[in-house]
Amino acid sequence: MERYILSLDQGTTSSRAILFNKNGEIVHIAQREFKQYFPKPGWVEHNANEIWGSILAVIATVLSEASVQPEQVAAIGITNQRETTVVWDKHTGLPIYNAIVWQSRQTADICEQLKQQGYDELFRKKTGLLIDPYFSGTKVKWILDNVEGAREKAEKGDLLFGTIDTWLIWKLSGGRAHVTDYSNASRTLLFNIHTLQWDDEILNILGIPKSMLPKVRPSSEVYAKTIPHHFFGVEVPIAGAAGDQQAALFGQACFEEGMAKNTYGTGCFMLMNTGEKAVQSKHGLLTTIAWGIDGKVEYALEGSIFVAGSAVQWLRDGLRMIKKASDSETYAEKVDSTDGVYVVPAFVGLGTPYWDSDVRGAVFGLTRGTTKEHFIRATLESLAYQTKDVLAAMEADSGIALKTLRVDGGAVKNNFLMQFQSDMLGVPVERPVINETTALGAAYLAGLAVGYWKDRKEIASQWQLERQFEPQMAKEKQEQLYAGWKKAVKAAMAFK
């Protein structure tokens, strides 16, 4: 009987279940979208029970469509949208409020107060993160402050908090396991990434009872088994968990210090493995835990770019310049340059290394001769410039010069963008055969825990290159183009 690993990839807009075989190949995928809630401008919420329902649906679909029996699943790995926050009643199992999504800005006031009280440096030193509505800590505080009776219940020990991985493990195990892994814990703003413990001082500042928090475990370990009535009468080990970006780093087999990957999704997330040392950034990067495995914790530097693939959606839906995303490549290839045009896609501010939430999008260098092709090309180039900004910060912080960049995500299908990215960075860009690196990373973590794969060496040997893009641009031209980008960003930031 052939065995498989089931990876549950719980994302921001949809849930997916992917079956992988021994060679790390995709056997089948099932996907289901779920509803987004926007109660007020800047707020984004999900219904945690709807997420759970979507997970049950994709599990059933993937097994039946692939004709795989539940007994053939050797283990389950979970990867998830990070930071999104669920608080539920441990007796009824019901959430007391919607899940507050990572993108939601509803805790901006709480963050502002904390900054004014001078806590910035304390939080950064302990957690590796910035005080920002993005992370879970202030979201938990908001729920306790704004849901009637929540604080009393929390003090009595009746409420549980979890990121999405924790919620799904709790549900799948029938409430037997309240756990998270090191990578997800490191995104909460509550976890000390040096002592590897929940931080009492921060919990006190935010007024969050410790009894709400899950146990923090390695990213590759059997946390619990599924209860039979949630998995067709079978008990399957839930054996791996990691936040989506860390899972992608693992799926890309970036196991050596200095290896990095960039995921081009709605935004871009670039992570560099820094080994067993937590490198504190001086250039606006986040210090995060990559994973805990084999009795060790390894760290990463992370850069976040808020707008990447969504800039191409904007060309399609907002400006109606293209009919489908892939047209952007065709148009960009029709011209030799942008003819001096720069697009700064700061629709929701700028992330690493600028961290300016007030700056807005801008276009520079337009002339009467500017065409649609120039504009589309400039929009694609902005993704590569932003990635270069992040890499420059990483190299400065880590002292490691990048040798190659591994890439994944929707936009990596765009050959023009990948070539321009390689030209801008001056290093080869490697696109793998399997683009589902996030789900693959979670599968690998689970498979290692149950002996389905032997070790990381075996996994690294499965990584396959689909295409390598080599830098072809003269250094002088590259520097000139990048200087223009820096000038454009500076001008955009001055216009407020």
Swiss-Prot record:
Any Pfam family matching the protein: FGGY_C
Gene Ontology terms: cellular component: cytosol
InterPro entries the UniProt entry points to: ATPase_NBD, Carb_kinase_FGGY, Carb_kinase_FGGY_CS, FGGY_C, FGGY_N, Glycerol_kin
Molecular function per GO: ATP binding; glycerol kinase activity
Residues that hold ADP according to the record: 12, 16, 266, 309, 410, 414
UniProt keyword RNA-binding, yes or no: no
Entry annotated with the keyword Protein transport: no
Single biological process term from Gene Ontology: glycerol catabolic process
Enzyme Commission number(s): 2.7.1.30
EC main group: transferase
Residues annotated as binding sn-glycerol 3-phosphate: 12, 82-83, 134, 244
Activity control, per UniProt: Activated by phosphorylation and inhibited by fructose 1,6-bisphosphate (FBP).
Catalytic activity field: glycerol + ATP = sn-glycerol 3-phosphate + ADP + H(+)
Phosphohistidine found at: 230
Record's keyword terms, sorted: ATP-binding, Glycerol metabolism, Kinase, Nucleotide-binding, Phosphoprotein, Transferase
Binding site for ATP: 12-14, 266, 309, 313, 410
Metabolic or biological pathway: Polyol metabolism; glycerol degradation via glycerol kinase pathway; sn-glycerol 3-phosphate from glycerol: step 1/1
PTM statement from Swiss-Prot or TrEMBL: The phosphoenolpyruvate-dependent sugar phosphotransferase system (PTS), including enzyme I, and histidine-containing protein (HPr) are required for the phosphorylation, which leads to the activation of the enzyme.
Family, as annotated: Belongs to the FGGY kinase family.
NCBIfam families cross-referenced by the UniProt entry: glycerol_kin, PRK00047.1
Function: Key enzyme in the regulation of glycerol uptake and metabolism. Catalyzes the phosphorylation of glycerol to yield sn-glycerol 3-phosphate.
Subunit structure: Homotetramer and homodimer (in equilibrium).
Listed name of the protein: Glycerol kinase
Gene source species: Geobacillus sp. (strain WCH70)
Gene assigned in the entry: glpK
